[in-house]
Curated annotation (Swiss-Prot):
Full protein name: Caffeoyl-CoA O-methyltransferase
Binding residues for a divalent metal cation: D163, D189, N190
Cofactor note: Binds 1 divalent metal cation per subunit. Fully active with Ca(2+), Mg(2+) or Zn(2+) ions. Active at 35% with Mn(2+) ion.
Chain residues that bind substrate: K21, D163, N194
Entry similarity comment: Belongs to the class I-like SAM-binding methyltransferase superfamily. Cation-dependent O-methyltransferase family. CCoAMT subfamily.
Classification via InterPro entries: Cation-dep_OMT, SAM-dependent_MTases_sf, SAM_O-MeTrfase
E.C. number: 2.1.1.104
Pathway: Aromatic compound metabolism; phenylpropanoid biosynthesis
Keyword list, A-Z: Calcium, Lignin biosynthesis, Metal-binding, Methyltransferase, S-adenosyl-L-methionine, Transferase
Entries under Pfam families matching the protein: Methyltransf_3 (PF01596)
Known partners and oligomeric status: Homodimer.
Length: 247
């Protein structure tokens, strides 16, 4: 069992590793938010899954604890019941969703790596919410294309969260806009992409950050002028853009 000090070091270290993922100006301020309003109210299962994920070599991919709290609040505010998640990893945001929606709520969860999902599955099962999850391994686009063919799927989702391959974000949006209901919400994660969206051309960015930055910028420009949605870009985690379908 990790000590409180271990947990602090894990969170702080990860925060530094990704270059202020919370986009705040100091680690101390981010730690204040976590210790004051996030960790004290974090569900025990969420805490356990966060600690399990911290030991995984790709833990940089997980949803931050403050973003998990935000998603939980949002889901409850909009009374979401039928939801979708593209990009699962070990399931931290998935668990946040499963805990927030009603007992008869559903989550269609898609990821290309089932092994990562199974790492968090025991925690999800222990929390008693695994019955809400329909996990499908593989690329999401073919699944979405099949769903769109059936009219009954149009406008059937209350909430959709996307945290997957950034080079396909626009492709996802073109399909998801038909699947989310009018008044429903789509959340796109990483839309400030480690702050690189405002980095100068010659900035010393990591190769993967530089590669995906153009796709993130393209998405942000498209969402900003899409008349079918209202948007709100928030500096939570690595940036999340909330899109509410209005027509």
């Amino acid at each position: 069992m990790a000590t409180n000090e271990d947990q602090k070091q894990t969170e702080s270290g990860r925060h530094q590793e990704v270059g202020h993922k919370s986009l705040l100006q100091s680690d101390a301020l981010y730690q204040y938010i976590l210790e004051t309003s996030v960790f004290p109210r974090e569900h025990e299962a969420m805490k356990e899954l966060r600690e399990v994920t911290a030991k995984h070599p790709w833990n940089i991919m997980t949803t931050s604890a403050d973003e998990g709290q935000f998603l939980s609040m949002l889901l409850k505010l909009i009374n979401a019941k039928n939801t979708m998640e593209i990009g699962v990893y070990t399931g931290y945001s998935l668990l946040a969703t499963a805990l927030a929606i009603p007992e008869d709520g559903k989550i269609l969860a898609m990821d290309i790596n089932k092994e990562n999902y199974e790492l968090g599955l025991p925690v999800i099962k222990k929390a008693g919410v695994d019955h809400k999850i329909d996990f499908r391994e593989g690329p999401a686009l073919p699944v979405l294309d099949e769903m769109i063919k059936d009219e009954k799927n149009h406008g059937s989702y209350d909430f959709i969260f996307v945290d997957a391959d950034k080079d396909n974000y626009l492709n996802y949006h073109k399909r998801l806009i038909d699947l989310v209901k009018v008044g429903g919400v789509i959340g796109y994660d990483n839309t400030l992409w480690n702050g690189s969206v405002v980095a100068p051309p010659d900035a010393p960015l990591r190769k993967y950050v530089r590669y995906y930055r153009d796709f993130v910028l393209e998405l942000n420009k498209a969402l900003a002028v899409d008349p079918r949605i209202e948007i709100c870009m928030l500096p939570v985690g690595d940036g999340i853009t909330i899109c509410r379908r209005i027509k």
